[in-house]
Amino acid sequence: MAKKLVNKIIIVGCGPGSMKFMTGHASQYIKDADVLVGSRRLLSLFQNSEAVKYTLNRNYKQLITRIISLSKNKSVVVLVSGDPGFFSYAKLIVDKAGIENCVVVPGISSVQLAFARIGRTWNDACFMSLHGRTGRLAELIRRVREHEKVAVLTDNSNNVKLIARKLLDEGLKERKIYVCENLSLNKERIREFDVTSLQRVQVKGLNVIIILDEESSE
């Protein structure tokens, strides 16, 4: 069991992007924080906060030690995008500090919003993140073969064109794909494609794609 901290580390899910999707519970913890830890994008949402700010980039493991140290006499809130339980920094913190020293505040994930936008349920979906990960396309293909719904977090390296080419190479051209860009933001865009046409689409940044096997669900 981890040593008990004076102040619990608060891990807050900030939602898919827009402040209007952040819960009131999350906002209150952030308002009361002495220290905010998060990515530059998330910290920029709270420029008016008087809390001391620590930027999270590739310094994950080193920063955990700092967070634990700061929690001895300060209220530390760690900001994560979406929901803390969905491909986030939360697991590293909980594993290191112990759940007895943490409070995890859920948020709305980009995947939840993506499924809401296309009017589909997500309780029967398979989820995968390619964000910042390499060599995972074979695993993606396996999951697409095994599941009728697969939601994927993409990035510039693992982009939709690359995924479309891989699906075609593997004989999976009959899938329907929704590309969900800038979810909750002003430039939000939801588009539907077949695999062949998706090869011609240029999509940048972090996005959610939902791959559907419509034939199996009929």
What do these predicted regions represent?
Residues 52-59, 100-105, 122-129, 172-179:
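Short hydrophobic/aromatic-enriched beta-strand-loop microsegments
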